[in-house]
């Protein structure tokens, strides 16, 4: 009995079916997770947000060496910006690298003209510039700008002092580095409905990145980090846990999809389809899914358009028409209505 009670702590807790992707680009993603137990929206949302912001690795320029320049307070002949301004502009360059090893990238430009991040060359092609339009310097007629930069992988924010090592040449200038590929993370917790209950959480998570990592991957990596960090707190053998696949019917038989207990009114059907189901006295999804396509098409005013609408909505919930629900026991309130 003690073990059964222990497993009930998490086995009986409601869990989200899947993550709904509302928007997905290389730079922005919006994800909805529901239903969650009350309080878990803010618990999970806050934890994921903090991990996404602080713990994902990215690439950044950590030092620069400019021809004929000894320190950051210098100027370069024929270049509008001084070295301090050039360094500030280099901090804005966003990179993507395919290796964890330090890499060297270069600029060799001649005026007149504007130097942008797109002028950066990666000798071995392992470093990709994500914002090639980013401004670096302005050169006048006859001016040249030759720079060699070091790219490293890290996480969070590193001050210039931390990017300096004993073997750094005197004319190499370490710079502050923002490694995080994340621009911004936001989450909102709202209400989610399961059957007639509305006291569940819905977590909406928005992630903005610099393009070096996809938003959906950022969320997945953060979830993996959180999972790995939490494993140490589990003080029992998980392999001994009895299998728990879902909700059983009242007789203790096979497991059935939770959505079967929902009302057809929750499907947000068109007025025509909704009226057809009402006329056919179909109130719950378990009644609907037992009907075949041919049976539904015999319903008055029910056509192909309504059929396709219902099939699509059922498929989203893992259901379909013509299902065999042998052993399924309807909710007690439905039995009472039929008496």
UniProtKB/Swiss-Prot annotation:
SUPFAM superfamilies assigned to the protein according to its UniProt record, in alphabetical order: C-terminal domain of RNA polymerase alpha subunit (SSF47789), Insert subdomain of RNA polymerase alpha subunit (SSF56553), RBP11-like subunits of RNA polymerase (SSF55257)
Keyword Nucleotidyltransferase: yes
Alphabetically ordered keywords of this record: DNA-directed RNA polymerase, Nucleotidyltransferase, Transcription, Transferase
Segments for region (Alpha C-terminal domain (alpha-CTD)): 256-339
Pfam families xrefs: RNA_pol_A_bac, RNA_pol_A_CTD, RNA_pol_L
Entry superkingdom: Bacteria
GO cellular component annotations of the record: cytoplasm; DNA-directed RNA polymerase complex
SMART domains reported for this sequence: RPOLD (SM00662)
Root EC class: transferase
Catalysed reaction equations from the record: RNA(n) + a ribonucleoside 5'-triphosphate = RNA(n+1) + diphosphate
GO biological process: DNA-templated transcription
Keyword Transferase: yes
InterPro entries (alphabetical): DNA-dir_RNA_pol_insert, DNA-dir_RNA_pol_RpoA/D/Rpb3, DNA-dir_RpoA, RBP11-like, RNAP_asu_C, RNApol_insert_sf
EC number from the UniProt entry: 2.7.7.6
Record note on domains: The N-terminal domain is essential for RNAP assembly and basal transcription, whereas the C-terminal domain is involved in interaction with transcriptional regulators and with upstream promoter elements.
Function summary: DNA-dependent RNA polymerase catalyzes the transcription of DNA into RNA using the four ribonucleoside triphosphates as substrates.
Family: Belongs to the RNA polymerase alpha chain family.
Name of the protein this chain belongs to: DNA-directed RNA polymerase subunit alpha
Organism taxonomic ancestry: Bacteria, Pseudomonadati, Thermodesulfobacteriota, Desulfobacteria, Desulfobacterales
């Amino acid at each position: 009995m003690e073990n059964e009670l222990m497993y009930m702590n998490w086995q009986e807790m409601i869990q989200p079916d899947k993550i709904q992707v509302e928007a997905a680009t290389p730079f922005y993603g919006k994800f909805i997770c529901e239903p969650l137990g009350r309080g878990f929206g803010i618990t999970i949302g806050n934890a994921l947000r903090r991990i996404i912001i602080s713990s994902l690795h990215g690439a950044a320029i950590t030092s620069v060496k400019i021809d004929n320049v000894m320190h950051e307070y210098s100027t370069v002949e024929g270049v509008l910006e001084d070295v301090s301004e050039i360094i500030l502009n280099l901090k804005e360059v966003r990179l993507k690298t395919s290796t964890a090893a330090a890499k060297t990238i270069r600029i060799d430009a001649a005026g007149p003209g504007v130097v942008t991040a797109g002028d950066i060359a990666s000798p071995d092609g392992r470093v990709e510039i994500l914002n090639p339009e980013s401004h670096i310097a302005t050169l006048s007629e006859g001016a040249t700008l030759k720079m060699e930069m070091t790219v490293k992988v890290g996480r969070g924010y590193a001050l210039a002092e931390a990017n300096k090592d004993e073997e750094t040449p005197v004319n190499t200038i370490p710079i502050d580095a923002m490694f995080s590929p994340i621009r911004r993370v936001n989450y909102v917790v709202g209400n989610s409905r399961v059957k007639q209950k509305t006291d569940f959480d819905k977590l909406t998570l928005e992630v903005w990145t610099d393009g070096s990592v996809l938003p959906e991957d950022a969320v997945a990596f953060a979830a993996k980090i959180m999972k790995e960090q939490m494993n140490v707190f589990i003080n029992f053998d998980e392999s001994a846990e009895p299998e728990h696949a879902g909700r059983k019917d009242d007789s203790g038989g096979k497991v059935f999809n939770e959505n079967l207990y929902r009302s057809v009114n929750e499907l947000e059907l068109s007025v025509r389809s909704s009226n057809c189901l009402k006329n056919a006295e179909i109130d719950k999804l378990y009644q609907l899914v037992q009907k075949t396509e041919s049976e539904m098409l015999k319903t008055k005013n029910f056509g192909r358009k309504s059929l396709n609408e219902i099939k699509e909505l059922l498929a989203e919930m893992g259901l379909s028409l013509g299902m065999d629900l042998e052993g399924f026991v309807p909710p007690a309130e439905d039995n009472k209505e039929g008496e």
